[in-house]
Swiss-Prot record:
Entry's Gene Ontology cellular component terms: HslUV protease complex; proteasome core complex
EC numbers on record: 3.4.25.2
Gene: hslV
The protein's name: ATP-dependent protease subunit HslV
The species this protein was found in: Shewanella piezotolerans (strain WP3 / JCM 13877)
Control of this protein's activity: Allosterically activated by HslU binding.
Listed CDD domains: protease_HslV
Pfam family, one: Proteasome
HAMAP family linked: HslV (MF_00248)
Annotated active site: T2
Principal place of residence: cytoplasm
Length: 174
């Protein structure tokens, strides 16, 4: 698996991810890029889960985003509607964290769309570690969203064997 974390603070949203790709108990790659920019660099997305499933989810979301002119919430909801009617796609083992200047969302391989109440997202095998660290940093420091995402991902990588210290970090200021 992997760890993806998204933090929003002071007109800045960041999605960061590690680079480890595992097959069972074996590390197959350490520098994968699981965080990307979409729709004219206005949307950030990071994926965790089975690689093929994650790419399928990612590509479907990107197509919906283009179809709906970059409207994040609408693209996510419309994708979820389609998802539930497609028996083959209903059980993808993957998650997406997506964010723009207005919203942060989790999109699951089951067709669920979740908007966290505090705009903090952490998914993947190290997600609980990253979320705990990011929550503590948000509540007790004045660090930027970028600094919090980076530090929480580092902490997750120190604890989770399926998360490494190679980081891809994308940032939007709005």
């Amino acid at each position: 698996m992997t760890t993806i974390v998204s933090v929003r603070r002071n007109n800045q949203v960041v999605i960061a991810g590690d680079g480890q790709v595992s097959l069972g108990n074996t590390v197959m790659k350490g520098n994968a890029r699981k965080v990307r920019r979409l729709y004219h660099n206005k949307v950030l997305a990071g994926f965790a889960g089975g690689t093929a499933d994650a790419f399928t989810l990612f590509e479907r979301f990107e197509a919906k985003l283009e179809m709906h002119q970059g409207h994040l919430m609408r693209a996510a909801v419309e994708m979820a509607k389609d998802w539930r009617s497609d028996k083959v796609l209903r059980k993808l083992e993957a998650l997406l964290a997506v964010a723009d200047g207005e919203a942060s969302l989790i999109i699951t391989g089951n067709g669920d769309v979740v908007q966290p109440e505090n705009d903090l997202i952490a998914i993947g095998s190290g997600g609980n570690f990253a979320q705990s660290a990011a929550t503590a940093l948000l509540e007790n420091t004045e660090l930027s969203a970028l600094e919090i995402a980076e530090k929480s991902l580092t902490i997750a990588g120190d604890i989770c064997v399926f998360t490494n210290q190679f980081k891809t970090i994308e940032e939007l200021k709005y």
